[in-house]
From Swiss-Prot:
Belongs to the PPR family. P subfamily. Keywords: Mitochondrion, Repeat, Transit peptide. This is Pentatricopeptide repeat-containing protein At1g03560, mitochondrial. The keyword Transit peptide applies. One of its GO terms (cellular component) is mitochondrion. Signal peptide: none annotated. PPR repeats lie at residues 151-185, 186-220, 221-255, 256-290, 291-325, 326-360, 361-395, 396-430, 431-465, 466-496, 502-536, 537-571, 574-605, 606-640. It holds the Pfam family PPR_2. The keyword GTP-binding does not apply. Coiled coil: none annotated. It is found in: Mitochondrion.
Length: 660
């Protein structure tokens, strides 16, 4: 039988790419093949390969939308499933170097172009929201399509993605594009932009959107107001946020709990905790119940102000109202009570937390352990550490470091070293605070060589040596009369390590130099400190004045004290410290001269100075003189004769007493 073959006919393919260099190509199992000499049409009967001839003029690419048009099938377009094109485009957005060329090839192959609505929808998708670089590349690629222009929603969607990544530079560029094209503002776009700009505190862009809303007759919603205020507060424009709040109070849209929380947060950030507290009470009088966020914001602000009493009061309010107290709030309240030395109250809050079903974390245990350790109750701190471990919590390096610090301050260095080795065994990274506590403890125990080895070990382990570590070792050197080593370490501190020499560093070294009678070197060190602009503390001047007074240079100490006054440094207790030092050294006459100097400057001598002098006289066997000074009419450097107040010098009284 004769076998007939039907001649294939040419059909334009609407969803296949055009072969530019060939008049025809091979199509096999859904794929296109190149036409070359190795491909023979005779093999088509056995391999299901057929010739397909393309038309010389393909139809134009079709714009695709994120949802299929089913308006003729359903009445409502809500809850529509995305078009299959969406998932295919998302699969191509892989961030690779060939991503854009893959997108080009795909669109050519299927004769499609992505509409602005499609681009906006893809940018909003969960797959892209946390990939700002891919979103940016896709946005830039899509605008290269022929006859394509981004709409406002595309820009808004991109800003939202970039805001999550806090990419302010790109957001500013996109914002300038929006302004340039003068899109008419919509409610949804305005709200989204205000939210994004507000998160980043971009006030200029925020106010531009606000003006565009007014120009387009868009009425702000409560949502809009809240995000506007949040943006102003984030940028520390608290006064502006306050004015917006006042507009809301007098307008149609009233503040809600979010508005109040934002305003309270603004006051707290600006350090106006009292105004924040007033706003909290005002909120309650207007029928708005404070929530967990309100109280948490206030507790954090009060803790930062060291107003621990208010922290406790706010916590008690939360407890009474049945508001869930977050772990961080418990940590702050317990920490505040511990800092005030109210360890029993802190422990009560801790137990109350557990009783109410809240599980403590490592941070809360650490706060309480630190409180016990700093108060000298090291045994209680260790017991709490063991309880923490028994309950399944693993102490971190901070927990161990506060225990070690407490042990070292109580002279229990061996136990501290045991915990140090435990941390190493557990693979915990020892921090500089941990090392400085051990170095200080070893130094005070006279184990200076071990302290020095530990100091050098820090560098080997890659642990940064801060001023606390240097100060601990310098203090160890000076206390054991190794002043030269202390001076060498002091120089190395700045020259090699670039570590700041603090006023405490100078205080330690000054004290050590004076103890070794290296007075001139100490004075040069003092001058160096002043030249560097480091303000001396009372302790620092005490180290200097004590050294000078004991070496008979009281006038020099007084002169230096006078030089500090123009610098704005007023050390009220400085003269008292010097008098105390002289009295302890038995130099009563010099102490009296110094007391007279106080009255000559127009200041009254505190009664406690007379007490110091009386005690000094009694200790050197001048009990009769001490009694006369105690019962004399001189109170604080003055003698009263009826209504007349006459200045009396201490030296005169002293000479009179000696003469009698």
């Amino acid at each position: 039988m004769r076998r007939f073959y039907r001649k294939p006919f040419s059909v334009p393919l609407l969803n296949r790419p055009h072969c530019s260099s060939q008049s025809h190509c091979l199509y096999k199992n859904g794929d296109f093949l190149s036409d070359d000499s190795k491909c023979s049409p005779l093999s088509s009967s056995r391999t299901s390969v057929r010739w397909v001839f393309n038309s010389s003029s393909l139809p134009p690419p079709e714009w695709i939308e994120p949802f299929n048009d089913v308006s003729d099938l359903v009445k409502s377009n809500r809850n529509l499933l995305p078009s299959p094109w969406v998932s295919q485009i998302l699969n191509l957005l892989d961030g690779s170097a060939s991503m854009e060329s893959n997108l080009d090839g795909f669109c050519r192959k299927f004769l499609i172009k992505l509409s602005p609505n499609f681009v906006s929808f893809v940018l909003k998708s969960d797959e892209i929201r946390e990939k700002p670089d891919i979103a940016w590349s896709f946005f830039c690629w899509s605008r290269k399509q022929k006859k394509y222009t981004h709409n406002l929603e595309c820009y808004v969607s991109l800003v939202d993605v970039l805001a999550l990544a806090k990419d302010v530079d790109r957001i500013r560029f996109v914002s300038s594009e929006i302004k340039k094209f003068e899109f008419p503002m919509t409610v949804s776009a305005a709200n989204a932009l205000i939210k994004s700009f507000g998160k980043l505190g971009m006030v200029e862009e925020l106010l531009w959107v606000w003006r565009k809303m007014k120009e387009n007759g868009i009425e702000p919603t409560l949502y809009t107001y809240n995000f506007l205020m949040n943006g102003l507060v984030s940028a520390m424009f608290v006064d502006s946020a306050e004015r917006v709040f006042e507009v809301m109070e007098s307008g149609r849209i009233k503040p809600d709990i979010v508005t109040y929380n934002t305003m309270i947060k603004g006051y707290c950030k600006a350090g106006q905790t009292q105004k924040a507290m007033e706003k909290l009470r005002d909120m309650e009088t207007r029928g708005h119940e404070a929530d967990k966020i309100t109280y948490m914001t206030m507790i954090q602000a009060c803790y930062a102000d060291s107003d621990f009493g208010s922290c406790v009061a706010l916590y008690q309010e939360m407890d009474e109202k049945g508001i869930q107290v977050p772990p961080h709030a418990f940590s702050l309240v317990i920490g505040g009570l511990c800092k005030e030395g109210k360890l029993n109250e802190g422990y009560t809050v801790f137990e109350n937390m557990i009783r109410k079903g809240s599980k403590p974390n490592v941070a809360i245990y650490t706060v309480l352990i630190d409180g016990y350790a700093k108060s000298g109750s090291v045994e209680d701190a260790i017991r709490l550490l063991h309880r923490m471990i028994d309950e399944g919590f693993k102490p971190d390096v901070v927990t161990y470091s506060v225990v070690v610090n407490g042990l070292c301050k109580n002279g229990r260095v061996e136990e501290a070293l045991d915990y140090f080795h435990t941390c190493r065994f557990d693979g915990l990274a020892i921090n500089s605070m941990f090392y400085s506590s051990l170095i200080d403890g070893l130094g005070k125990a006279g184990r200076v060589d071990e302290a020095e080895r530990l100091f050098e070990e820090m560098s080997e382990k890659g642990c940064t040596r801060d001023s606390y570590c240097y100060n601990a070792l310098i203090d160890a050197f000076t206390k054991h009369r190794k002043v030269d080593e202390a001076i060498a370490l002091f120089k190395r501190m700045e020259e090699e390590e670039g570590c700041d020499q603090t006023v405490y560093t100078y205080t330690i070294l000054l004290s050590g130099m004076f103890k070794e009678h290296r007075n001139e070197e100490a004075l040069k060190l003092w001058d160096m400190m002043i030249d560097k602009g480091i303000t001396p503390t009372a302790a620092c001047f005490r180290a200097l004045s004590t050294g000078l007074c004991l070496s008979g240079k009281v006038a020099r100490a007084c002169k230096i004290l006078d030089e500090l006054a123009p610098m704005g440094v007023i050390l009220d207790a400085a003269c008292e410290d010097m008098i105390n030092t002289l009295c302890k050294a038995g130099r009563i006459k010099e102490a009296c001269k110094l007391a007279d100097g106080i009255t000559e400057r127009g200041r009254e001598v505190p009664g406690r100075i007379r007490t110091v002098m009386i005690n000094a006289l009694r200790k050197v066997g001048k009990a009769d003189l001490a009694m006369k000074l105690m019962h004399s009419k001189i109170g604080i450097g003055y003698e009263r004769m009826g209504s007349v107040k006459r200045r009396v010098k201490f030296t005169t009284l002293l000479e009179t007493c000696f003469d009698s």
